[in-house]
């Protein structure tokens, strides 16, 4: 546990948290919406600090990040809690509980970095739950990781305030854009606009950005919803920004909703390509050609993927160009 960052003290021993757009006002002895920040005698503490509930070595493709050091392995970690209440959460067993009410292992930032060194991982991924709610642990670990020549990636719902994001030593982000404003209100108990602002700010800060949209049947799968996300990515983030359409599987409080039809995912991908996006993917469908990276100019297979295994085919890793036609590929290697 350590004192939280980005908060202010108020009268009557209350505090206001400024880590995310909720700006929770927290009374003494209580916690904020995310369960990770507690007011103890008028001081806000990150009570989930170091309570690591999940630690693994993952292919970076699993995040998913397809254009940021493809084929590499990263240390992936999580601490319990979230600042959303998504009805369809795929990781609800750790995200929808306080960090001290689920199994965890006490770890320090130094120990996380030592794991990365031991397993020759070039980077660390803050993922599985919502990293914003364990910001202090992510921040401290990121600083040490960067000092050791490693990169940091954040897999996030994008619900973070501007100043914390600016201060964070993060190199790449996969940001969920879950649907329209109504979807955020009804399904996530959150608002859309701050997520869009995070996407734009991350791009402006020079962070590598990829976007994921989990398509939930009858919730966010109509053409207007898809076009909204496609046009935002194209017009605000750039045609080169990878967009992942992922398949929903029944979980948590939406177990009565069927899996996303593969035809819907293919329709979304084709629509995005028609609207001008250069790199569009289908996720959670093992073996689908929509997992692969193709040259946006000649269509040559650049990176072949099966589940989370990636193999570079017709991509020149020195020049970042297609070996077939010479097209410059937007990728970090």
Curated annotation (Swiss-Prot):
InterPro entries: Aldolase_TIM, AmmeMemoSam_rS, Organic_radical-activating, Pyrv-formate_lyase-activ_prd, rSAM
Cofactor(s) essential for the protein: [4Fe-4S] cluster
Name under which the protein is recorded: Uncharacterized protein MJ0808
Keywords: 4Fe-4S, Iron, Iron-sulfur, Metal-binding, S-adenosyl-L-methionine
Gene3D superfamilies, A to Z: Aldolase class I
Co-factor remark: Binds 1 [4Fe-4S] cluster. The cluster is coordinated with 3 cysteines and an exchangeable S-adenosyl-L-methionine.
Record flagged with keyword S-adenosyl-L-methionine: yes
SUPFAM superfamilies xrefs: Radical SAM enzymes
Superkingdom per UniProt: Archaea
CDD domains, sorted: Radical_SAM (cd01335)
Keyword 4Fe-4S attributed: yes
Domain (Radical SAM core) ranges: 67-274
Record GO terms (molecular function): 4 iron, 4 sulfur cluster binding; catalytic activity; metal ion binding
Binding site for [4Fe-4S] cluster: 82, 86, 89
Organism for this UniProt entry: Methanocaldococcus jannaschii (strain ATCC 43067 / DSM 2661 / JAL-1 / JCM 10045 / NBRC 100440) (Methanococcus jannaschii)
